[in-house]
Amino acid sequence: MIIIFFYDFDAFFGTEERGQYFKRDNEQDNFLKIAQALFKHKNLTLRQIEKIFTNTRLSLKMFSHNEYVCPDVLFLLTYFHICESDLYEKICHKNYDIQGLVDQLENSIPQCIFKVDESYNKYRNRFFLFTIAQLIACYAVEGYAHVSLITDKEPNKNRELLFTAKFMDNKTLVEALEWTEHQYRGIFALSHITNKISLLENFKN
């Protein structure tokens, strides 16, 4: 994806200062995976793509080098902000309960991205589901509390979703949500990202 180099994302992700904190996080690769998946399956105009990249790059300027970003979630939210602004605003204002959010995400994102049983796109689609899981987990943060998204661990029993996903692979979502439970810096209130995007809008107005 040649266009991404025009925006010089490496100037943020590739700095020596940031590498001291997040060298193992593969931030730019994660960012690219989400961009490629969305642009492959969404019929976006060049203007929309340019706006998504521009807004993402400007939002990154508001993060310090030692501040956690979660670039794949940032990019997905920026896509919603540019292309599906009503959904984005309702996410920002937490107008949905968890089930409502999941329903809206499944309606917005092409179903082919959720398929993890096709070898060609299996890895990329699985990564996308992990990004969705992290977005949902961050949305579920309420102050110092966190809405439960999967059943508690029990001996000899698989954990299950506490919401219904019609199109997303349930097993992969459970794995992804279990993964988020063990990320010491990966779960935060979604406002950590949306405030940066909204602050950018204030500068424009």
Regions found by a protein language model. Name each.
Residues M1-I3:
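A short helix-turn-beta junction within AAA+ P-loop NTPase domains corresponding to the substrate/partner-engaging
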Residues Y7-N205:
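The feature marks long, low-complexity, polar/acidic/proline-rich intrinsically disordered regions embedded
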